[in-house]
Amino acid sequence: MWRLRIGAKAGNDTHLFTTNNYVGRQIWEFDANAGSPQELAEVEEARRNFSNNRSHYKASADLLWRMQFLREKGFEQKIPRVRVEDAAKIRYEDAKTALKRGLHYFTALQADDGHWPADNSGPNFFIAPLVICLYITGHLEKIFTVEHRIELIRYMYNHQNEDGGWGLHVESPSIMFCTVINYICLRIVGVEAGHDDDQGSTCTKARKWILDHGGATYTPLIGKACLSVLGVYDWSGCKPMPPEFWFLPSSFPINGGTLWIYLRDIFMGLSYLYGKKFVATPTPLILQLQEELYPEPYTKINWRLTRNRCAKEDLCYPSSFLQDLFWKGVHIFSESILNRWPFNKLIRQAALRTTMKLLHYQDEANRYITGGSVPKAFHMLACWVEDPEGEYFKKHLARVSDFIWIGEDGLKIQSFGSQLWDTVMSLHFLLDGVEDDVDDEIRSTLVKGYDYLKKSQVTENPPSDHIKMFRHISKGGWTFSDKDQGWPVSDCTAESLKCCLLFERMPSEFVGQKMDVEKLFDAVDFLLYLQSDNGGITAWEPADGKTWLEWFSPVEFVQDTVIEHEYVECTGSAIVALTQFSKQFPEFRKKEVERFITNGVKYIEDLQMKDGSWCGNWGVCFIYGTLFAVRGLVAAGKTFHNCEPIRRAVRFLLDTQNQEGGWGESYLSCLRKKYTPLAGNKTNIVSTGQALMVLIMGGQMERDPLPVHRAAKVVINLQLDNGDFPQQEVMGVFNMNVLLHYPTYRNIYSLWALTLYTQALRRLQP
């Protein structure tokens, strides 16, 4: 039976190292002797229910660890369920009861170290690069045991589309990229090309989809790179990724420092592998794949003609003639000049050494977690190519388990975890609901959560001359996952700072030892560092690149990948934190904080769409963006009465509320750049919770409360018997095209909305 282990309990290794005793680390382990017959039956039922209903909802409810935690804590829901019949007659007691039920359930899910574990997967291209890397290096069976492979195959079966392909993410129609690499993944873990199973001939259907759509030469660049290192594609059919790029000076329009942090991290490993033209040693399976993936004989393919191919199903960012001409020029210079004698000895070898120096620096600085599962695979493979027995590679191997997550739908690979983000957003609604009569359960939850925040803050900048190594300050920030990962993010920092400021106001006998005030100041320094001239704030690093550089993006299936950008959600979160900070510490960098807030408000107001919404970047999409925008404006003192953008935002939500009283936004909004409801205008619990929060913050309860009551009725009536809420559509996103699953959102935004709603009822009802 699978068990989730937390922190130092998650196992140790001589090649692991940590900054805070592994606080926030979460590792799945298989124990053949664990689990009673009843527990095992419950797990199988959860798996069966997902498989039977996967055509209805594509994402798992993340039940396995929740079942484990609830059993271990002896959870029992004793508070009776509330059912609302007439929205206009909701009583304070009804809303409060629903909130208490949800809190009782949710607090039982907190880990001992103070964070809330959760799945953070969804993209269908996270698994295969790691599997391919481990296969090439000969460590597949060490990392992916028989039990791992059973769950991996289960996941692939569950998320294969009816046409035989896999989508970019679990809700997407099939694309070439994910179908090709997942087909390869299944073949590597032992599924035969014509294997018959309960789902039909999975590989047969996938191969048919690939061949019917032109073959694997139509996979985008990242897929071509995965295939090239495996030896089932030729490097000459890839757009160039020369390691000499890292020699470009900072005065050049594009250089290592101007790249978006994720593209830099991926390109760093790929440029080394490309520069070496590394290809795995052929195996019988590799030779079979060469014949299985293409409609023509492998030896007859003209790779030069495949370089710019990309299946129409994959194409989100089409290349222009100018872009194709640019990459052709880079290829000629890189391969016809730099890769030939004497330049291959004088320049190429020096570039490869520089690339590995950069790569090792980045890996050490983030404890070999890297920036995500895709760069992780390329970094790890590059280290193995450099030295198969080296310490760098062994340190990478020790961190692979940090990416593995087990759900009722099988084994998936995460980005690298959302521990901090999920935790700090959970603490927000708990802190918003703090009253004089806080019970022991809530107090204990808050204290543990505060302790987690204190231990998770990044307290140092990257080592040595970090600017030369394309790193920026990190001291004072909080990461998306855990401290060891080492990449602080602006919104994670802002939301954590706001929580710590609220804890700072509480008596020590309630919350224990408080955070050093200097660390609060460090967080403010980090946020101020990231604001751009336009008033917006970026996510990881200052926005140094020119927007026209996006025209030369080599990545076909996502948008905005070349340079760092400002984000409305991050800006809203930062305003919330800094307005609270200015109230408690009005003299610290007073003018800079005031200027940040003023410019940030203008940035948010300038970004508002014609319909009154804001386009979100990290969630689906216009409701999500509107929530963070309005939250920032309200924190800065704006109201429905003195702020036209807030009035327009409220009108947008009232206009899009469905007949049931809820909201449900489709991820297609992200692609169409226009609000798009779910098919049939059905309700989604996350969208409804977020919209309900905006209406309350916008003062709708004081003007016409019925739309708010109708939305609250939806949230209350959707609550399950145990206090949980139903898992529906995926509501996280990145790069405007890739869904990222946050199963905890169904709890966070439902309970946060109910918290604000009960407070509004208490104020208004006699």
Swiss-Prot record:
GO annotation (BP), single: triterpenoid biosynthetic process
PFTB repeat extents: 149-190, 520-561, 597-637, 646-687
One of the record's GO cellular component terms: lipid droplet
Active site (record annotation): D491
EC code(s) of this entry: 4.2.1.124
Keyword Ribonucleoprotein: no
One term of GO molecular function: lyase activity
Keyword Membrane: no
CDD domains the UniProt entry points to: SQCY_1 (cd02892)
Substrates-to-products reaction catalysed: arabidiol = (S)-2,3-epoxysqualene + H2O
Family matches, as InterPro entries: SQ_cyclase_C, SQ_cyclase_N, Squalene_cyclase, Terpene_synthase_CS, Terpenoid_cyclase/PrenylTrfase
Alphabetical keyword list: Lyase, Repeat
Chain's role: Converts oxidosqualene to arabidiol. Minor production of arabidiol 20,21-epoxide.
Stated family: Belongs to the terpene cyclase/mutase family.
Name the record gives this protein: Arabidiol synthase
